[in-house]
Amino acid sequence: MSPQTETKASVGFKAGVKDYKLTYHTPDYETKDTDILAAFRVTPQPGVPAEEAGAAVAAESSTGTWTTVWTDGLTSLDRYKGRCYHIEPVAGEESQFIAYVAYPLDLFEEGSVTNMFTSIVGNVFGFKALRALRLEDLRIPTAYTKTFQGPPHGIQVERDKLNKYGRPLLGCTIKPKLGLSAKNYGRAVYECLRGGLDFTKDDENVNSQPFMRWRDRFLFCAEAIYKAQAETGEIKGHYLNATAGTCEEMMKRAVFARELGVPIVMHDYLTGGFTANTSLAHYCRDNGLLLHIHRAMHAVIDRQKNHGMHFRVLAKALRMSGGDHIHAGTVVGKLEGEREITLGFVDLLRDDYIEKDRSRGIYFTQDWVSLPGVLPVASGGIHVWHMPALTEIFGDDSVLQFGGGTLGHPWGNAPGAVANRVALEACVQARNEGRDLAREGNEIIRAAAKWSPELAAACEVWKEIKFEFPAMDTL
């Protein structure tokens, strides 16, 4: 280590302000297997050199502050400081660069996403020397990964619980999202489940409002689940949203769901918070409940290309905190999501080992070792004509969720569910026979519609519906 970057208590305390780069920019540093690595997109203020801006990010997200303090001499900053070890330009952006920062593992509490984010995406994002700052990716070392429980159950255990294999799972968000009474809500759930869906879902903003208190909703939905199971012979579920104003109330709702014997509950992990989410995930594993995660508020954090945090980081954090499903965009529907980037973080959710691949936005190789995987949920503006593309893009280990694409069917909820189930089964069969879903998708759907009047009606209603806007999230 060069004399410039080494911090020695023996030289005595010298008050004053010095450039961050003298201590925190260390281009010769060799990263350790135990370091947490971060890739930041940095937009400095005019006149701030890249080395100084990158070093400032490393400093302000680890041990540094704006001036020298005498207590620096009471510890070893070389052991604990973050280091900006590499800087690279951003193609097509003269004012931006990627700063790579390494953090010693001792800076973070074991098993706490909350603590990790408090440092890495804390006050540094308001630093005046930066015009904008975005966390593009994190490398979580194996040593830190092993301190997390992760998803309550994971993909294989969920399939075993549901006894459903070889195809994506089908879901539906009950609409209108607000305003239904508990009994009418339960009726809508029943109609969808008996028609062929595997799951129905509370909308993310359904908690416990005056028009429908949570306990009433839970009871009527449980009744709908059991009735649909008896009629179809299949295991069914409804994502009962346990999100609440306090952790205690959230846990009370999860306990009641377990007492009803339902298979799955739901949480809004960003608005609810990582501490609450991790607590709920631990409860779900201990009590046999699956946990569906909604990402409400994510676009506030991840949609701007130059500031905030990319969703792949939020996806990694969710896998650590715990969840069996998480919404991940659709590529083809009404919500944001470019194909290669979406598939990049979908792999980060599902797979054990993911190689670095900058073409898909993956900055670091990630080894999850034995942490269970998470099912990505495709939801938002999708309908039967999208089924071939969704099946081809997301594969079997996914949940395809049609809200308006089920309840908007001209004949009602159950026929809407039938249409989606028939379309899915047709696509899976065609794929298994070796047909090209991307090229022959429409033909496959039309052929299935000839013997399914429910699917034929759905095809007619949504034949002209498209959401063709350019994606914001591009490389």
UniProtKB/Swiss-Prot annotation:
Residues 1-2 form a propeptide. The disulfide bond which can form in the large chain dimeric partners within the hexadecamer appears to be associated with oxidative stress and protein turnover. The modification N6-carboxylysine is found at K201. PROSITE patterns: RUBISCO_LARGE. Substrate binds at N123, T173, K177, R295, H327, S379. Mg(2+) binds at K201, D203, E204. The keyword Oxidoreductase applies. It comes from the Eukaryota. GO terms for molecular function: magnesium ion binding; monooxygenase activity; ribulose-bisphosphate carboxylase activity. The record marks K334 as: Transition state stabilizer. Its cofactor is Mg(2+). The basic functional RuBisCO is composed of a large chain homodimer in a 'head-to-tail' conformation. In form I RuBisCO this homodimer is arranged in a barrel-like tetramer with the small subunits forming a tetrameric 'cap' on each end of the 'barrel'. PANTHER family: RIBULOSE BISPHOSPHATE CARBOXYLASE, RIBULOSE BISPHOSPHATE CARBOXYLASE LARGE CHAIN. This is Ribulose bisphosphate carboxylase large chain. It comes from Carpinus caroliniana.
